[in-house]
Amino acid sequence: ESMVPMSEIFQPEPLVASLRPLASAAPLSAAELAYRQFYGFVPREAVESRLGWFEVDGYRIAAQLWQPIAPRATLLLLHGYYDHSGLYRHVIEWALEAGFAVLAVDLPGHGLSSGPRASISDFAEYQAVLRAALQQADALGLPAPWHLCGQSTGGAILIDYLLNDQPL
C-alpha cells in the first residue's frame, strides 16, 4: 500500500485565491467546505461558520469563525509554529460544546495565510496579527468575555501580549 502525498490530496492555492474578507457573511463555498471536510470539521446546526481573511501589515491572514446562535463567550485560538488552525478541530469542538464562539487565525506564513513559509522578520509581526484579530472579534460583535488559547508559538504570542501590551 503506497502513501499518497498530502500535496496530491489537498491543494490550498485555489482555496486561498477564492477566500473572501472575513467580514463578509457569505455561506461557505464548495472549496471552503472541502477544506473543512479534509480536516474533519463537521457542519453544526445553529452555528454560523466563516472562512476568510483580513489584512495586517501586508499579510493576508486567513481566519475561521464559528458562532453559535447565542454564544456565552469567545475563544481566540492561535496555533503553534508550523501548524495552522485546521489542525485544532478538537479544541474548536470543545469550545463550541461549551457555548463559545471561536475565532482561529493562521499566522503569517502558515496554513492559508500569506507570507514566506514559517518565517517572519520580527516577533512583533505576530503581535500585530493578534491585535488585528482582536479588532476583528470586536468588529464582528463576538461576545465577551474573550478567552485566549495559544499552543507553543501561539502561547508565546499571547503571553507577550499580556505582559507588554494594553489588553482590550
Tell me the role of every PLM-derived stretch:
Residues 3-55, 61-67:
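An N-terminal hydrophobic leader/cap segment in hydrolases
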Residues 72-73, 99-100, 144-145:
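Short coil/turn segments at beta-strand junctions that form active-site/ligand-binding loops
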Residues 72-80:
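Short beta-strand element of the alpha/beta-hydrolase
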Residues 79-86, 151-155:
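Short, conserved structural micro-motifs that define repeat-unit consensus positions
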Residues 81-87, 111-141:
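Catalytic nucleophile-loop/oxyanion-hole region of alpha/beta-hydrolase
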Residues 92-115:
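Conserved alpha/beta-hydrolase
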Residues 141-152:
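Alpha/beta-hydrolase fold nucleophile elbow
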Residues 155-166:
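Short glycine-enriched nucleophile-adjacent loop
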